[in-house]
Amino acid sequence: MTPRRKAIILVSCCLSLLIVSMDATIVNVAIPSIRADLSASPAQMQWVVDIYTLVLASLLMLSGATGDRFGRRRLFQIGLTVFALGSLACSLAPTIDTLIGARFLQGVGGSMLNPVALSIISQIFTKPVERARALGIWGGVTGISMAAGPIVGGLLIETVGWRSVFWINLPICAAAIILTAVFVPESKSQTMRNVDPIGQGLGILFLFGTVFTLIEGPVLGWTNPRVLAIAAVAVVALIAFLRFESRRHDPFLDLRFFRSIPFTTATINAISAFAAWGAFLFMMSLYLQGERGFSAMQTGLIYLPIALGALFCSPLSGRLVGRYGARPSLVAAGILITTAATLLTLLTATTPVWHLLIVFAVFGVGFSMVNAPITNAAVSGMPLDRAGAASAVTSTSRQVGVSIGVALCGSVAGAAMAGSGTDFATAARPLWFVCIALGLVILAVGFFSTSQRAVRSAERLAPLVAGAPDPVNGAHVR
């Protein structure tokens, strides 16, 4: 395969990452405009964000297995098409309920993109050096999309309207579909994994039940029969999931992974960091445009330090992990996220913009330091043929974290969610204390995850899971 064709394949894969990553920051900037135009309640606005991330979390691992079985290029093209249709439906949504349904469709399409694109990259770039370079470019696109998202979103919302933040996905999807059809070869795994529909279904029940309880509990009342019933379903689903998966030969989630302390702590850190991230983005959009009266464009500019932190500090974090291990980056991330959340407790209706920019910069740098050590710790000590599966679990954990973070906005800061006014900052303060706790978890786990005991636990796990089927490696390309 020629270098030119490989480069075009990488571009088509990166386009999928661009739309999925940019969607997070763009939609958060649009939340106040959507709320005003569609007369949405606070809980409905949480669902606009959470239905997308929940579907991503629920289907990421299944999409990887499906691509292995039926063809990665085929599933990638289907994912792009479904994501484009979901984006079109979002842009035309006449009601908030229709928008939530369209976001569900968007999430289904998005779940087929990044895991399959990574698998395509792994099969096309076979030499270690070129694969590392390709994955470095892939990681850089995340920073670029985060940097572009708030600015592009703010500009589009201010000049065209909030519906345009979904229109922008359509030409990108079209370009990716054409490039994939022309240049990407079909590939399938030599080892077909069995699909685990029962485990998958129980996991989905648990995730949706938990988030429903957190979002609707403050609205309907924590003792409301429907809230209690769905909370009970979530608990039963979790218990059944753990029992079923522990007995299955080829489970949806290999619970033995959690015998590795580095893997377990990586999962905890992924959920903690991304819960803080989801809560921060969602609540600050309401604060900036509702409490402070900033325009969507001004809000996008205030978000910029976060994106710049990701763009410039993510590569630094990767180098630190490569040279010194996960601990320095995790400790730095924990300290910075905790510091940013502490500064957020001081917010008022008249906090100077320079103070906000400092908070966003500190949070952005802290958040950018956490991704590389999470991935590194997740695969630490894992056999090569299980690294993809371990990494997929942490990718899912990231989306679970965002869903929980957004859901907590209503549970912990319901008064602030109910409307703007001079009490917004005060009502939101409990949420920032939760973010402080999440930052401290990252800090504490950062020390523990790299201890000698942790290393030994990973070494003991490796022979137990070696040779099990993995969704990433061993493809036949035709």
Residue ranges and their predicted role:
Residues 1-182, 314-317, 324, 328-338, ...:
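Transmembrane-helix bundle of Major Facilitator Superfamily
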Residues 141-178, 195-203, 210-231, 432:
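Helix-loop-helix hairpin linking two adjacent transmembrane segments in secondary transporters
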Residues 120, 124, 155, 183, ...:
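A residue-level signal for alpha-helical anchor/packing sites in multi-pass solute transporters
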Residues 1-5, 449-478:
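Intrinsic disorder in cytosolic terminal tails and internal cytosolic loops
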Residues 177-204, 246-261, 322-323, 385, ...:
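Flexible interhelical linker loops that connect adjacent transmembrane helices
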Residues 96-97, 161, 188-192, 217-223, ...:
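Membrane-interface helix caps and helix-loop-helix hairpins in membrane proteins
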Residues 170-189, 204-216, 233-248, 442-452:
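C-terminal membrane-cytosol helix-exit motif in multi-pass small-molecule transporters
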Residues 7-22, 27-29, 42, 212, ...:
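12-transmembrane solute porter fold
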